[in-house]
Regions:
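A glycosyltransferase accessory/donor-loop signature
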Residues: 2-4, 151-156, 173-282
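A conserved donor-nucleotide-binding helix/loop in the catalytic core
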Residues: 68-104, 108, 116-119, 206, ...
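Conserved donor-nucleotide/metal-binding helix-loop-beta segment in metal-dependent transferases, i.e.
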Residues: 104-135
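A conserved mid-domain beta-alpha-beta active-site/ligand-binding segment of alpha/beta enzyme cores
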Residues: 149-166, 171
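Class I (Rossmann-like) S-adenosyl-L-methionine-dependent methyltransferase catalytic domain
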Residues: 281-377, 396-401, 405, 412-467
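A conserved beta-strand element that flanks and buttresses the S-adenosyl-L-methionine
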Residues: 385
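Short catalytic micro-motifs in class I SAM-dependent methyltransferases
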Residues: 388-392
Length: 467
C-alpha cells in the first residue's frame, strides 16, 4: 500500500565536519525534491555539535533536535531518533545517513503497511554470522533467505544497508524500543561481528533482529531509494522503470566537494552523479565548504591561488607593496596562512570562517592574532588584505557586504583580488561567482583616492587601493 499523508525525514549530525557538509546538501535536496517543506526535515545533533552548524540548519528552516549518544556512541546514535520524534505529527518517517543525497521525490516509493529498507549491498555480515547471532538471540524462526543487492552472496531478508529506512507511524514506538534493546544486546554479544570485521554494523544487524523478533512487517525497498556508487557492482533490486531517487555516495567526494566516481560507469549512474553534483553546486555555502576543504583536503587548503607558483608570486607582491612595513595588517579570509606565514609582519589579525583553517594558522604563527567570525567589527588597520574571498560570494548582497567591511576597516591601503570580467569557466564553476568588475565595485565606494592594478594570477586581478 503506497504511502499517503505527511512524511518527515530525519538524520543525525555528529561533531565531525563531514556530517555537517553532507547533511547540509542532504537537507537541501530533501526540501527541493520531497515537498518543499523545511520543517519536514529533522536534524538531530549530538551534544558536541558546534552552535554554528546548528544555526546553519536552523537558518534553512529545518526542525532541530538534540539527541544523546547511544550504545557505542559511534554507529548506533541513529537509534535515538525515533524517540525524539515521538510528539511530532507525521504518518511515516524516513531515517537517512548524511552521506546520501536526494535526486527525486522519495515519497511515491513509500508504504503505510510495512517498514522499508534496502537489502545490503554485499554480505556484511556473512550469512553464517547472522545464523550465529540468531541462535544466540533465540530467534524462533529464521527469515527468508534472499540475495544481496550485488548478487555476491545470500543474506536474510531484513538485513538492510543502514542508509535508508522508511517507518510508518504505527510501527515507530515498537521499533524504537526493540531496536535499542537488541542493539544493547548485540554490543554485549559482539564476537560474531568482531570475528568477521563487521563491528560497525551493529545498527543494521540490531534492526534485523528487532523487526523479526517483534514481528514487524517489512518489505524490501528498491535500490532506487539507496543506490550505492562507492564501488562498481550490480544493483539487482533496482526498479529499471523508475529514476534513482537517493544516492548513497559513502563520502566519494573530490577536492571541490563534488561526487566523483571512476570513469566507465553506466550512463544511468553517470547521469545520477551529474544530478547530484548540480544539487551540491547549487547549495554552495562558504561556511560548510571551507570547513570541509581544510579538514578533508588540507593539502589543497585555500586552493590553487595559495599554492605553487601563485603562492610565491603573491608573497613577493606583498613584500613589494610594503606589507612588512605596515604598522598593522588585517587579513580578511586568511585561510591556512600559506602565503603570509613567512613574512615579517609586526601586528597581524587574520579572520576566517573556518575553524580548521585557523587551527593551522595558529600553529604556523602563534604570535599572531586570529579570529573566527564572518563579520567582525572594529578591526581597522593600516593595510588590509583580501585575496580570493570576493570571488566566492554567492550573492551580490554578500559580495557588497565584504567590500563594505574592507572599506570601513582600511586606514591606509587595501590589497584585494577579484574578477575583472565574467567568463564561461566562471559560469561553469559552482564555487565562484561574478557580480561586476572588481574595479567598478571599488570605485563606486568613493573611499579611495587611488586605485591601480598591481598584479594578476590565474583568472583574478589584484588591486591596490589607497585612501
Amino acid at each position: 500500500m503506497s504511502g499517503s499523508g505527511r512524511t518527515i525525514f530525519s538524520f543525525v549530525v555528529d561533531a565531525a565536519y563531514s556530517f555537517t557538509y553532507h547533511g547540509w546538501h542532504l537537507a537541501r535536496s530533501l526540501i527541493e525534491h520531497c515537498g518543499g517543506d523545511p520543517e519536514a526535515v529533522h536534524v538531530q545533533c549530538t551534544p558536541e555539535v558546534d552552535q554554528r552548524w546548528r544555526d546553519l540548519f536552523r537558518e534553512l528552516g529545518c526542525a532541530m533536535h538534540q539527541i544523546s549518544r547511544f550504545g557505542d556512541g559511534r554507529y548506533c546514535n541513529k537509534l535515538n531518533q525515533l524517540e525524539s520524534l515521538g510528539t511530532i505529527a507525521f504518518d511515516r518517517v524516513v531515517l537517512l545517513d548524511t552521506d546520501t543525497i536526494a535526486l527525486a521525490d522519495l515519497r511515491p516509493f513509500l508504504r503505510d503497511d510495512a517498514i522499508l529498507g534496502k537489502i545490503v549491498d554485499v554480505a556484511n555480515p556473512p550469512l553464517a554470522a547472522l545464523d550465529e547471532i540468531a541462535a544466540a538471540a533465540a530467534m524462533r524462526q529464521r527469515p527468508a533467505i534472499c540475495k544481496t543487492d550485488t548478487l555476491d552472496a545470500d543474506t536474510y531478508i531484513g538485513n538492510c544497508n543502514g542508509g535508508f529506512y522508511s517507518i510508518p507511524r504505527a510501527f515507530c514506538a515498537c521499533l524504537s524500543v526493540e531496536w535499542r534493546r537488541w542493539a544493547l544486546w548485540l554490543l554485549d554479544n559482539m564476537e560474531p561481528l568482531r570475528r568477521t570485521g563487521c563491528q560497525n554494523h551493529v545498527d543494521q544487524v540490531s534492526f534485523w533482529l528487532a523487526i523479526h523478533q517483534a514481528g514487524l512487517p517489512f518489505a524490501a525497498a528498491p535500490a532506487n531509494l539507496n543506490y550505492f556508487i562507492h564501488f562498481d557492482g550490480k544493483h539487482s533490486y533496482l526498479d529499471e522503470t523508475r529514476d534513482i531517487a537517493l544516492l548513497h555516495h559513502h563520502h566519494c567526494l573530490n577536492v571541490l566537494g563534488l561526487l566523483e566516481i571512476p570513469p566507465g560507469r553506466s550512463p544511468r549512474e553517470e547521469a545520477a552523479v551529474l544530478r547530484g553534483n548540480q544539487q551540491i553546486g547549487g547549495g554552495f555555502d562558504n561556511r560548510v565548504f571551507w570547513e570541509m576543504r581544510y579538514q578533508g583536503f588540507p593539502e589543497r587548503g585555500s586552493g590553487v591561488g595559495s599554492r605553487g607558483y601563485n603562492l610565491l608570486y603573491k608573497r613577493q607582491l606583498l613584500k613589494e607593496q610594503g606589507v612588512e612595513a605596515a604598522a598593522n595588517v588585517l587579513d580578511f579570509g586568511c585561510g591556512d596562512l600559506e602565503v603570509v606565514k613567512e613574512l615579517a609582519i609586526r601586528r597581524y589579525v587574520g579572520i576566517d570562517q573556518s575553524s580548521a583553517a585557523l587551527d593551522v594558522a595558529r600553529h604556523a604563527r602563534p604570535d599572531w592574532d586570529f579570529r573566527l567570525t564572518p563579520r567582525p567589527e572594529g578591526q581597522p588597520a593600516e593595510m588590509v588584505l583580501c585575496f580570493e574571498v570576493l570571488i566566492h560570494q554567492k550573492t551580490e548582497a554578500a559580495y557588497r557586504a565584504v567590500i563594505a567591511f574592507l572599506v570601513e576597516n582600511t586606514l591606509g591601503s587595501l590589497l584585494v583580488s577579484g574578477f575583472s570580467k565574467n567568463s564561461e569557466s566562471i559560469r561553469q564553476n559552482p564555487m565562484v561567482f561574478f557580480h561586476e568588475p572588481l574595479e567598478t565595485s571599488l570605485r563606486r565606494t568613493g573611499r579611495f583616492k587611488r586605485i591601480q592594478q598591481v598584479g594578476a594570477h590565474t583568472n583574478v586581478v589584484i588591486y591596490r587601493c589607497d585612501v
